[in-house]
Amino acid sequence: MAGNFWQSSHSQQWILDKQDLLRERQHDLLSLNEDEYQKVFIFFANVIQVLGEQLKLRQQVIATATVYFKRFYARNSLKNIDPLLLAPTCILLASKVEEFGVISNSRLISICQSAIKTKFSYAYTQEFPYRTNHILECEFYLLENLDCCLIVYQPYRPLLQLVQDMGQEDQLLTLSWRIVNDSLRTDVCLLYPPYQIAIACLQIACVILQKDSTKQWFAELNVDLDKVQEIVRAIVNLYEMWKDWKEKDEIQMLLSKIPKPKPPPQR
């Protein structure tokens, strides 16, 4: 996306402090521990990814939808809106902002119903419960909570520039790109600028592919390497968690622990 990141609402309003983020989560962390909380967000990032792929959206749109989802819950408890409703709402909004084209509401609902039945039946025993009016109402609430700050800068563009500057081949770009996609399952998109995330993902890819010759190139970068290493640790921790996590066995239990909205008082 063209424009100056440093003058954007992404830079000025949506690079959050880690302590503030943890403080906002305290209510949810009464019901879920930190690992469980992260697993819930990994699951819903996967839901957004599957819905996006079935709608044939570009990865940029899927990534923006995932960032909207994480931004909303950075300021709100999970009990405020059912994540299963917010996920398709974020996709609908991201497709508009990223100028992908209009997704028909009926098609979105149909894809949600199909995905829950075929891809996520291990998590949900009932059908997708929401209709168009729920998603449109949720979209207003989402816009309000994002302060209408809808332009999201992603790490993909700086990653392309870095790989070109490094003079490396497609294999490195392909792996780095996948790691950027994986990074959306962590908090790094809320805490760090996209160019730092791109550098961290590129560094992980170089280690995996044993590109020892790139060490000098990284050393000469004008970047806060401590921040880059924090991002690397967050992504490596994600991979460590993934190794041992049996999602299909655990997710129903985790979803049942999510705090639910209180029903309105009976009149």
Swiss-Prot record:
InterPro entries reported for this sequence: Cyclin-like_dom, Cyclin-like_sf, Cyclin/Ssn8, Cyclin_C_2, Cyclin_N
Disulfide bridge partners, by residue number: none
Intracellular or extracellular location(s): Nucleus
Keyword Cytoplasm: no
Domain of life: Eukaryota
BP terms from Gene Ontology: regulation of transcription by RNA polymerase II
Pfam family, one: Cyclin_N
Protein family: Belongs to the cyclin family. Cyclin C subfamily.
Role, per record: Component of the Mediator complex, a coactivator involved in regulated gene transcription of nearly all RNA polymerase II-dependent genes. Mediator functions as a bridge to convey information from gene-specific regulatory proteins to the basal RNA polymerase II transcription machinery. Mediator is recruited to promoters by direct interactions with regulatory proteins and serves as a scaffold for the assembly of a functional preinitiation complex with RNA polymerase II and the general transcription factors.
Protein name from the UniProt record: Cyclin-C
Organism: Drosophila pseudoobscura pseudoobscura (Fruit fly)
Organismal lineage: Eukaryota, Metazoa, Ecdysozoa, Arthropoda, Hexapoda
Gene symbol of the encoding locus: CycC
